[in-house]
Amino acid sequence: MTTMQLDSDGRLRHLLTLEGLPRTTLLQLLDRAGQIRDAAVGRVGKRSVLAGTAVCTLFFEPSTRTRSSFHLAAQRLGADVLNFDASTSSTRKGETARDTLKNLEAMGVRGFVVRHPDDGAVEALATAAGEGTALINAGDGRSAHPTQGLLDMLTLRQAKGTDFSKLKVVIVGDVKHSRVARSDLHALRTLGAGEIRVCGPASLLPDDGILEGCVVGQDFDAMLEGADALMMLRLQRERMEEGLVPSLEQYHTEYGLTRERLARAGRDAAVLHPGPINRGVEITDEVADGAQSCVLRQVANGVAVRMAVLETLLG
């Protein structure tokens, strides 16, 4: 983990990855997010914690849930929010991401929520940030998506309790190219998950050591037995073009979550998916919309998690 996330006193300065993040810091963020979520039940309030603070969502890749969630989170904390769109900005004229950051900093922006297609891009920007400026990684390449990992953990706590020591969690699908899977794996390890199972086609499983300590297999039905939670990953359709998946139909046959398959898992197993869902590919309609689905709960928890992160970094 990069040490630049923490200041000399061990306080969070940026949120770039969950890898190596101290357990105490992770728990503090989750506890605070839970408090915010519970306080907001039945009402949507606006606070003034970040009144007068400018936050910019700096996205170099498309996003719906993450960008909207951060925008709402910052607004509810009273921040002034700027939305940066790379397609209509000076980056089209050749301006670098670093220069964009420094120019916005000069205008008084203190918080940057950054999504970028390149691994390590957000950390590189953080090295250029001035004192008092905080960066949040909203997804870079295939390396990290820390707030998604946090909201997944918050959703698991809500569904299964705070003690993860006996949890059997299955991560299914395109793990190799998934920044969400990597963040979830780091968080689950830090929180002491009892057993982490990883399942998918061999062509979509990473070989860089990230799965060390996990139970890894390609037989989805076998991996489902007794599972407490299932994290279904989006099949990135471009992988078909690379020849890594023969067809959507075959993928669904082997790794799609159906009602019949779900019955193999533990009673009341929680079903998670980071979205966007390819219905009929990773998961059927009846499971995605069923009683065990936590998909919309994940979306709702995302706002609380991002409020907690913004408050911690900028409040």
Curated annotation (Swiss-Prot):
One of its GO terms (cellular component) is cytosol. Its EC number is 2.1.3.2. Carbamoyl phosphate binds at residues 65-66, 115, 145, 148, 275-276. GO terms for biological process: 'de novo' pyrimidine nucleobase biosynthetic process; 'de novo' UMP biosynthetic process; amino acid metabolic process. It holds the Pfam family OTCace. Pathway: Pyrimidine metabolism; UMP biosynthesis via de novo pathway; (S)-dihydroorotate from bicarbonate: step 2/3. It catalyses: carbamoyl phosphate + L-aspartate = N-carbamoyl-L-aspartate + phosphate + H(+). Belongs to the aspartate/ornithine carbamoyltransferase superfamily. ATCase family. Catalyzes the condensation of carbamoyl phosphate and aspartate to form carbamoyl aspartate and inorganic phosphate, the committed step in the de novo pyrimidine nucleotide biosynthesis pathway. Heterododecamer (2C3:3R2) of six catalytic PyrB chains organized as two trimers (C3), and six regulatory PyrI chains organized as three dimers (R2). This is Aspartate carbamoyltransferase catalytic subunit. It comes from Xanthomonas euvesicatoria pv. vesicatoria (strain 85-10) (Xanthomonas campestris pv. vesicatoria).
